[in-house]
Amino acid sequence: MSFKKILVVCVGNICRSPIGEALLQQQHPNLTVKSAGLSALVGEGADEKAIQAMDEWDVDIRSHRAQQLTQELMQTFDLVLCMSKDQESWMKQNYSSQRGKVYRIGHWINENVADPYKLPIDKFYESRHVLSRAVESWKDKLA
């Protein structure tokens, strides 16, 4: 199957998923990549520490605005990548008609991406590092 539209999901859509979205878009500029949250802080920008972590890699995520995951949004995308096994299970149960397109972003490296929300900047660096490796692991599947 060809994946042309990818949705990256975390909880609030202000820390991990904006980073994952930016890294995927950077690696695959020909694809449509967006993000959403299970309990999104709708309309909020990316967390300042997420912005700082990505600035250090010369990736600007300041224009990001959080949006809520919905059934309609799920239907729009070919592949939906979440941060943990728990999120993957929840999404497959609650969006059962879309379950075949839901995967953990760290599927190929067998890792969850820890939530750095309200934690020190080093936790954002750790999440960014895992997301970078996870995105790299999808490279040949999305090309």
Map each language-model feature to its residues.
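Phosphate-binding/catalytic loops
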Residues: L79, K85-A143
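Hydrophobic beta-strand core positions in alpha/beta domains
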Residues: V8, L81-C82
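Conserved active-site segments centered on acidic
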Residues: M1-Q75, D140
